[in-house]
From Swiss-Prot:
Localization of this protein: Cytoplasm
Name of the molecule in the record: ATP-dependent protease subunit HslV
Record function comment: Protease subunit of a proteasome-like degradation complex believed to be a general protein degrading machinery.
UniProt-annotated binding residues for Na(+): A167, C170, T173
Organism: Bartonella henselae (strain ATCC 49882 / DSM 28221 / CCUG 30454 / Houston 1)
Amino acid sequence: MAEHKPDIMYGTTIITVRKGGKVVMAGDGQVSLGQTIMKGNARKVRRLGKSGAVIAGFAGATADAFTLLERLETKLEQYPDQLMRACVELAKDWRTDRYLRRLEAMMLVADKKITLALTGLGDVLEPEDGIMAIGSGGNFALSAARALIDMDLDAETIARKAMNIAAKICVYTNDHFTIETLDAELSSLEKAI
């Protein structure tokens, strides 16, 4: 586990859920500096690109995350409608560029076809079940969403319930959520049902 640096803003919860032809990404609004809550209504989930066809959420150092979001937007311009390729190219840069290597953040990104997590270690990960979460409350939200995914609930309801559970457990997560939704292609599993 990385050493905790008190002068860097840590902690948040970001989750994405794919179900029923929708992809939903939700993030809390708390920004913490060490043990102090600095802001309660930050927007850590946003749309990218001119068309807004990609949604992204970040956890980690805020300035670092914004740098990575800008880089991802540039990659999306280079590789339009190719989220996986844009993310792989960003991950390569993030891993090999001397400046980018120092950035402390993680990102979740999604479009109508795919959801991916990007890390500073060069990882570009796709969830098996259409659910992925990052941040200090990520494991709580992920567990809750997986428990709810087979229930008769839509993607947004699952994301909200999972975020509420994370907010009740994780001290770095609050219940002021930003939620973005996209129409999504049905997964092969959903098509079979």
